[in-house]
Regions:
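Serine-esterase "nucleophile elbow" of acetyl-processing enzymes
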Residues: 1-75, 79-89
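Alpha-helical cap/lid subdomain in secreted, periplasmic
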Residues: 56-62, 76-221
Length: 221
């Protein structure tokens, strides 16, 4: 098994791990090879919306998701991601990292994100990769930090000509009391909105016959 992730690890990171770190990984319809497979990568927000995306992609694509508390600067992040990339054939990756990185050194996070994209594209040549912005929070100061990371993420994604799913803009106009259940997380109604927005972002890159549409991906539409 190739250990490509070692080539892309940062030589140093100043970020310390959180008191509790966690990782959740599910592959649905694992034995089915008749439909393309979408990998959703994110954190607890991804853990919240994956079921809504999976429901909407029924009959179009199978879904794997990996939700983790780790920042892309964590030495083990790429190791875990590489294992998931190897597990099943993938057609499209919807990628987010950010809410557990709000206080991470910006230069380190940018370098690690860039290396993460490089590793994915090196590991899976021709894979369709989409950047997803982090969602806003109820705390304005934390939201401002998310905006900073989203701007960096969008710039790095543009370097690779990756399409972007601006989930931040979908959620930011909404009422914090109605659609948030705590500082970070969302109500069932908000998860439905996220699931619909993500599905609409993914669908142009998947056709209804179960084959990814490379021309749509190239256009970024």
């Amino acid at each position: 098994m190739d250990q490509i992730h070692r080539k892309y690890e940062l030589p140093h990171t100043s970020r310390r791990r959180e008191e509790f770190e966690w990782s959740i990984h599910y592959a649905f319809n694992a034995g089915d090879r008749t439909l393309p497979r979408v990998l959703l990568v994110g954190d607890s927000i991804c853990n919240g919306y994956h079921a809504q995306v999976r429901e909407r992609l029924l009959g179009i694509a199978n879904v794997t998701f990996w939700a983790s508390s780790k920042c892309v600067t964590d030495p083990d992040y790429l190791r875990e991601l590489e294992f998931i990339l190897e597990e099943y054939p993938l057609d499209l990756i919807h990628f987010n990292n950010g809410l557990h990185s709000l206080t991470t050194d910006r230069a380190e996070w940018e370098a690690a994100l860039r290396n993460t994209f490089r590793m994915i594209l090196d590991k899976l040549p021709g894979i369709r990769l989409m950047w997803c912005a982090s969602t806003p929070l109820t705390d304005p100061e934390l939201t401002a930090q998310a905006v900073e990371l989203n701007a960096i993420g969008a710039r790095v994604a543009a370097e690779f000509n990756l399409p972007a799913d601006d989930l931040f803009s979908v959620m930011n106009p909404l009422d914090r009391k109605e659609f948030w259940c705590d500082k970070y997380h969302f109500t069932p109604a908000a998860k439905e909105l996220q699931g619909e927005a993500i599905t609409q972002a993914l669908k142009p890159f998947l056709n209804t016959t179960g084959n990814a549409d490379p021309e749509a991906f190239r256009r970024g539409t």
